[in-house]
């Protein structure tokens, strides 16, 4: 073994290994104290990029779940108000049926109409005051809203809310009134029993209804027979014996064409009907009460269709939240395997580094004494 003074190779080697052990110890302590296996790009450049992408995805999924829950909250708020509106419409229908009874006096019908009018006002109040986060939901101003339910752009669903005010055109339809009233002794003529209705629905479907009335039926029996042939139209008779036809708004686009021998007999002509909504109903007369039932039935169907759509949206959002939670769980698990510290493994590494550091320190101290042996040769 060569003994030198200017260059202590043994000390240099011991120093190098001591520095390595110290660096490994510092890295282990950093990982254990932070809980992260990757604390800078030098630890794992590729792993850091993947981890950051997974973190962004996970945070996006978390926000998406909050957005979906907001959507459910809006739908629940609107649906709750619609539920109360349905109860109001049901009560108004009861009042209309009660008023249509022939035993009622004019004053009794007036009292029933006053309650019906008060319920109309409450229906409008609910529509105008139901809100979520400052946005009105049921007065027609909400329109459509997009709910971001994914971690990336474009992953959204659209939810729309429409007006349920008593004067909204969808809360009713069109009314048609025959010109000729018929008394109890009138019967359907044998040679004029045919009645034909033609109209186009809002969906663009051309509908033709052919009704062949029974010979000798009176005007009330005729209305009952028409109602039994179709649910597209509602027939009733007013106090003057005039046949009334009501078509709900979703079932009618444009004019209603009415033809046939019976149409001529009754003076029932098609054409622009009278726009009739819940706001317009008047149950102070038998005819108005009868027609009001058809209007309210149309309004109930409209509100029910809106509630059904909201229910479907709620179910969709609930399933979306469940799916997002499952995706987030798997993304977090993947990110954990890449980024998080394995404490069992890292503790072992730290113990190893501590032992090597202590050994390196001891060996370096001994290596520094080697040049001193040259002095003994000079004595």
UniProtKB/Swiss-Prot annotation:
Q: Is Glycosyltransferase included in the keywords of this UniProt record?
A: no
Q: Is the keyword Coiled coil assigned to this protein?
A: yes
Gene3D superfamilies xref list: 2.60.40.4390, 6.10.280.190, f41 fragment of flagellin, N-terminal domain, Flagellar export chaperone, C-terminal domain
One GO cellular component term noted in the UniProt record for this chain: extracellular region
Pfam families linked: Flagellin_C, Flagellin_IN, Flagellin_N
Keywords, in A-Z order: Bacterial flagellum, Coiled coil, Secreted, Virulence
- InterPro entries linked: Flagellin, Flagellin_C, Flagellin_C_sub2, Flagellin_hook_IN_motif, Flagellin_N
Record's subcellular location: Secreted; Bacterial flagellum
Superkingdom of origin? Bacteria
Which GO molecular-function terms appear in the entry? structural molecule activity
Q: Which residues form a coiled coil?
A: 103-128, 302-341
What does this gene product do? Flagellin is the subunit protein which polymerizes to form the filaments of bacterial flagella. FlaA is essential for flagellar synthesis and full motility. Important for virulence at two different levels: is needed for crossing the fish integument and may play a role once the bacterium has entered the host.
Record-stated family:
Belongs to the bacterial flagellin family.
Q: Which NCBIfam families match?
A: PRK08869.1-1, PRK08869.1-3
Known partners and oligomeric status: Heteromer of multiple flagellin subunits including FlaA, FlaB, FlaC, FlaD and possibly FlaE.
The molecule here is called Flagellin A
């Amino acid at each position: 073994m060569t003994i030198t003074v200017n260059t202590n190779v043994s000390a240099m080697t011991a120093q190098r290994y001591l520095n390595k052990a110290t660096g490994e110890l510092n890295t282990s302590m950093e990982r254990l104290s932070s809980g992260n296996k990757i604390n800078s790009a030098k630890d794992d450049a590729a792993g850091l990029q993947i981890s950051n992408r997974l973190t962004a995805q996970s945070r996006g999924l978390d926000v998406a779940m909050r957005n979906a829950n907001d959507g459910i909250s809006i739908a629940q708020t609107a649906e709750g108000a619609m539920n109360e509106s349905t109860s109001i419409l049901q009560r108004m229908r009861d009042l209309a049926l009660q008023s249509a009874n022939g035993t009622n006096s004019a004053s009794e019908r007036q009292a029933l109409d006053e309650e019906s009018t008060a319920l109309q006002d409450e229906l409008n109040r609910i529509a105008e005051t139901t809100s979520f986060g400052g946005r009105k939901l049921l007065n027609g101003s909400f329109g459509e809203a997009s709910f971001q339910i994914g971690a990336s752009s474009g992953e959204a669903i659209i939810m729309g809310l429409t007006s349920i005010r008593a004067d909204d055109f969808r809360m009713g339809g069109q009314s048609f009134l025959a010109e000729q009233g018929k008394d109890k002794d009138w019967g359907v003529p044998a040679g004029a029993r045919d009645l034909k209705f033609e109209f186009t629905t809002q969906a663009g479907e051309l509908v033709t209804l052919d009704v062949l009335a029974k010979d000798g039926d009176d005007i009330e029996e005729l209305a009952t027979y028409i109602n039994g042939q179709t649910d597209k139209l509602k027939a009733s008779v007013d106090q003057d014996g005039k046949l009334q036809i009501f078509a709900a708004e979703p079932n009618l686009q444009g004019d209603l064409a009415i033809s046939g021998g019976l149409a001529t007999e009754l003076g029932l002509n098609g054409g622009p009907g009278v726009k009739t909504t819940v706001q317009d109903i008047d149950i102070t007369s038998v005819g108005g009460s009868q027609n009001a039932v058809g209007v309210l039935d149309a309004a109930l169907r409209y509100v029910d269709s809106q509630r059904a759509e909201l229910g479907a949206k709620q179910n969709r959002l609930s399933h979306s939240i469940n799916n997002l939670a499952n995706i987030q769980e798997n993304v977090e698990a993947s990110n954990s395997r890449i980024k998080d510290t394995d404490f069992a493994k890292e503790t072992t590494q730290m113990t190893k580094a501590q032992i090597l550091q202590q050994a390196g320190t001891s060996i370096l101290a001994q290596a520094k004494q080697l040049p001193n042996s040259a002095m003994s040769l000079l004595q």
